[in-house]
Amino acid sequence: MFSIKSIQLCRYFSRKSGVLRYWHSAPYLTHSKLLEDKLIRPVDRSKETEKLLRSRLVYQSRKRGILETDLILSGFAKEYLSKYNVELLKEYDNLLNEADWDILYWCTGERQAPEHWLNSRVLRDLKEYLSSKNGVVRFMPEL
């Protein structure tokens, strides 16, 4: 048995085998195994103020992993986050915990979102935001 502490920062994902390999002696784990066993848990943010939550979500929307998602989510955050209540902000926070490519495919309609996101107002707003900006050249909005 191993613990989270045994997982080193140096890791890589092999797309061919679908196995996460960790540096040193940690065992091989599949991505789904990590999610099922909840080995990677989100940070507890239960004591976060609404102002801090909004600020963090704006930052996380701008600093993703791929440029396409950065451009989409940063514009979306600027336009929608000020209108959202705390409940919707937390839903958006959960969406940001998903992989960048998944978010991109779901909001563009390339792939269907998983069942737990099908009735999401945030994902619906994100799709609406993209469809209303058809043909617009995207750029990172100023803070």
Swiss-Prot record:
GO cellular component: mitochondrial matrix; mitochondrion
Record keyword Disulfide bond present: no
InterPro entries: SDH (IPR005631), SDH_sf (IPR036714), SDHAF2 (IPR028882)
GO biological process, one term: mitochondrial electron transport, succinate to ubiquinone
Cellular localization per UniProt: Mitochondrion matrix
Pfam families found in the cross-reference section: Sdh5
Keywords noted in UniProt: Chaperone, Mitochondrion
Role description: Plays an essential role in the assembly of succinate dehydrogenase (SDH), an enzyme complex (also referred to as respiratory complex II) that is a component of both the tricarboxylic acid (TCA) cycle and the mitochondrial electron transport chain, and which couples the oxidation of succinate to fumarate with the reduction of ubiquinone (coenzyme Q) to ubiquinol. Required for flavinylation (covalent attachment of FAD) of the flavoprotein subunit of the SDH catalytic dimer.
Protein family: Belongs to the SDHAF2 family.
Subunit field text: Interacts with the flavoprotein subunit within the SDH catalytic dimer.
Cross-referenced PANTHER family: PROTEIN EMI5 HOMOLOG, MITOCHONDRIAL (PTHR12469), SUCCINATE DEHYDROGENASE ASSEMBLY FACTOR 2, MITOCHONDRIAL (PTHR12469:SF2)
Remarks, miscellaneous: This protein may be expected to contain an N-terminal transit peptide but none has been predicted.
UniProt name for this protein: Succinate dehydrogenase assembly factor 2, mitochondrial
